[in-house]
Amino acid sequence: QKYGAVMWSGDTAASWETLRRQIPAGLNFCASGFPYWTADIGAFFVKRGDYWYWDGEYDDTVEDPAYLELYTRWYQWCCFLPIFRGHGTDCRRELWNFKGADGVFYQAMLRANKLRYELLPYIYSTAGKVWLYDASMIRMLAFDFPKDAKALEITDQYLFGESLMVCPVTETMYYKKSATGAEKQENPSKVRNVYLPEGCGWYDFWTNTYYEGGQWIEAEAPIERIPLFVKEGSILPMQQPANSTAETVMSGNLTFVVYAQKDCSYELYTDDGDGYAYEN
């Protein structure tokens, strides 16, 4: 806690099971007092290698549409981590290497990347609250909804900052691995069961549909988006994305999106984007 500025989950191997395990691992880690944690998008090892730990399931890497689907879902999840990073071996991780045959997965990742940039004022403000108030970047639902018995059992949804509930997709929908390669699924299910904690209402980030808390819903989860919900009474500061994080933060073109069924307020943290003045 004193010296670990940024931690990550280690050199993981690509599989859906690994992705599922990463989410509670990160939440438990951050619950112990480390605000900055991340994972290698798409796992560090993609192929099967000579050693026991080199145990990825995708020898064809970016040529395998099944891996492109897994990588896309991993990418969408990591968009809502304190540190957003593609890193690993076996294949290059620049986004344009993941275009595939029809570009569907590539476009889904571009959309997630754009959203990360749009949310930088929110992310930066959350980081400011970590510094100022010992807040957390990500946290399990039990922290905010301790009296909701169902929320206490949820391990694959979490809060990113104080307003966003992230619900990663951790099951394949489009391609199934087999002994002969990737099999495209006919009429795939494109929904994910999501629990909306009681005590407040929730807005679907993509559609602005309002839901009462304390219920399970089937959330739309096509490949182009991750189920994402905004807590009632939230204000989200957003910006138009630019060519870099620095340019985006410094552009000054702020938009405040208000999700109001009741009075609400928001504390925006900003600075000049350079130097150590924030320490004072």
Predicted features, each with a name:
Residues 237-280:
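Edge strands and adjacent loops of beta-rich recognition modules
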Residues 1-225, 230-231, 265, 270-278:
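Catalytic-domain carbohydrate-binding cleft regions of carbohydrate-active enzymes
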